[in-house]
């Protein structure tokens, strides 16, 4: 959420930075609400100070010998009671304006980092680096073709069970999914991450804190009777782990890793990636999440990205790193690196992880602070996929396919899968 003080003191900066995202905003209405809220706050504070002064004066006069039931003291007490009534009215008005202002601000995205390159769309994203040698050969199959030939998944039965964009994994496919999850969790916990297994159902406050609500409600599945939602990413419950908390500065950074099923409606993606594992309503993902001191978030962004890259390197999967431009940033992000893995069958790079620094945007929405001595301030948060399991499996199938119909797996997976090949059954 945007800083209300910044809205009052420097609205031009907000307009300029949102303009870098391609937004043309008129903040006049928000500024008016913020000014009214600030004026009410000042009037209330002034009246409270006057009420405290009168209360103190009552005590002093009684101590000096005035009759506690006399007219002099009664008049002061009457003034004090009248002030209390006015304060109560102002508090109610102030709460209403504060809630209105918060509701309006919740719909605005984060301001981009100064380091984020300007641009209008994904065409303006900047390639940062590449790793590995992409396999380029004629006649390579796409992952869904390989998966069907090896009987790894069944989409027709999944439609019968649920609907389109769901898959059921069988045999080697189910084993490989489990192996990848365990491999990734072990890799990250070996680097000091604390493993978390969060709830799959989250409340509206959690989705609001991470930035999914109110703007993206149509993209998630909701259990309306209970005010619960199927989580679209473990980023949501991980953000709320410390909602409404003050984290001592000597405990930072906090680094969490979580496996969770993820659920997305994929609104607006009709006709795209209709086969295979790339775009599903339900998929598994291992998520990385950091809470850091504000002064260390840029450094942490490089580190969390490197941790996501380490998975691809261990699995011997070629990839490239893109820095997203301002016009392609996610709602909560101030700066983002996308990792795109090479899919040899498709002959293209596809996104497999987004690693974002969200500055204090999520922390302000979730009231997550840190305290260093007498100073209390909002933390910074970061998140990144480490990695999406289905897309990782797709990359392994396409890059490891062999002429005999088998798929060669990287050595790092052998202890988890039990052998180095997927064989036709």
Swiss-Prot record:
Pathway info: Aminoacyl-tRNA biosynthesis; selenocysteinyl-tRNA(Sec) biosynthesis; L-seryl-tRNA(Sec) from L-serine and tRNA(Sec): step 1/1
CDD domains listed in its UniProt record: SerRS_core (cd00770)
Sequence segments annotated as region (Disordered): 108-134
Gene Ontology CC: cytoplasm
One GO term (biological process): seryl-tRNA aminoacylation
UniProt KW keywords: Aminoacyl-tRNA synthetase, ATP-binding, Cytoplasm, Ligase, Nucleotide-binding, Protein biosynthesis
EC number of this enzyme: 6.1.1.11
Binding, L-serine: 233-235, 287, 385
Subcellular location: Cytoplasm
GO molecular function, one term: ATP binding
Domain of life: Bacteria
Tagged with keyword Hydrolase: no
Biased composition (Basic and acidic residues): 117-134
Pfam families found in the cross-reference section: Seryl_tRNA_N (PF02403), tRNA-synt_2b (PF00587)
Residues where ATP binds: 264-266, 351-354
Function: Catalyzes the attachment of serine to tRNA(Ser). Is also able to aminoacylate tRNA(Sec) with serine, to form the misacylated tRNA L-seryl-tRNA(Sec), which will be further converted into selenocysteinyl-tRNA(Sec).
Subunit relationships: Homodimer. The tRNA molecule binds across the dimer.
Entry note about domains: Consists of two distinct domains, a catalytic core and a N-terminal extension that is involved in tRNA binding.
NCBIfam families tied to this protein: serS
PANTHER family (UniProt xref): SERINE--TRNA LIGASE, SERYL-TRNA SYNTHETASE
UniProt record similarity statement: Belongs to the class-II aminoacyl-tRNA synthetase family. Type-1 seryl-tRNA synthetase subfamily.
Protein name in UniProt: Serine--tRNA ligase
